[in-house]
A protein has these predicted regions:
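Short loop/edge segments at beta-strand edges and connector loops
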Residues: 1, 70-72, 78, 126, ...
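FAD-site-proximal beta/loop scaffold in flavoenzymes
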Residues: 1-10, 96-171
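Proline- and acidic/polar-enriched loop/turn elements at helix boundaries
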Residues: 41, 73-74, 115, 129, ...
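Structured beta-strand/loop patches that form or line metal/cofactor-binding pockets in enzymes
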Residues: 193-216
Length: 216
């Protein structure tokens, strides 16, 4: 979130992490003329999406000059004083990426470190996340949680629904469980949305399906 504090648009940027947030920011900054390089340990970004959609997204991002360094691990990040390009990102493969800024998109962490959870009988994991049951109740029967603080998928649409269900359960309002198939919205350019399982997941589970394609 510190990216919003930039005083001016950088000339170049290294984005570490090709997840949802990384892809969103990379495409936005690239369209504003920033030289963007993405680094991720995985061979394919956004692996939970249909591969055909991912391939098309990567193709379009390359068209706006985004460079992908996939299957690469960051060894260290250093800053240089009084240099025009102030950040050096060294990869374990020996490559060095030099840019004005580096944006680390390593997933959302729960903002719970200052809440003194122990006083309420709660304990967060190393990323500040709480454990809840299917009704979003924590270890304490009178405390409920939803959204980024309980982990995956940590998206706006799902967090809103989790919050609604948690509030209903807390006040004894009868509601059903969280839907198994929830909508996913990714605000990249172009935008991506999906609901349900991806094609490769259905194939792995030997579930018959049909494919329809509409281009627009």
């Amino acid at each position: 979130d510190e990216i919003f504090n930039l005083a001016e648009l950088p000339h170049s940027m290294v984005v570490i992490g090709a997840g949802v947030v990384g892809i969103e920011y990379a495409s936005m900054f690239a369209l504003m003329g920033v030289e963007v390089t993405m680094v991720d340990t995985r061979e394919r970004p956004l692996e939970f999406l249909d591969r055909e959609i991912i391939d098309e997204l990567v193709h379009q991002m390359r068209d706006i000059k985004v460079v992908f360094r996939l299957g690469e691990t960051v060894a260290k990040v250093e800053t240089r004083e009084n240099a025009r390009r102030r950040v050096v990102v060294s990869l374990e493969s020996g490559k060095r990426l030099i840019a004005d800024v580096a944006l680390v998109c390593a997933g959302r962490a729960g903002n719970t470190h200052s809440l003194n959870l122990g006083a309420a009988g709660l304990e967060a994991d190393e990323r500040g996340r709480l454990t809840v049951n299917d009704k979003f109740r924590t270890q304490q029967s009178h405390i409920y949680a939803g959204g980024d603080v309980i982990g995956f998928p940590a998206l706006a649409a799902t967090s809103s629904e989790q919050g609604r269900l948690a509030a209903c359960n807390a006040f004894g309002v009868e509601v059903g469980p969280m839907p198994t198939n929830f909508p996913v919205g990714i605000y990249s350019i172009p935008e991506i949305s999906m609901v349900g399982e991806a094609e490769h997941e259905l194939t792995a589970r030997k579930i018959p399906y049909e494919v329809g394609i509409a281009r627009f």
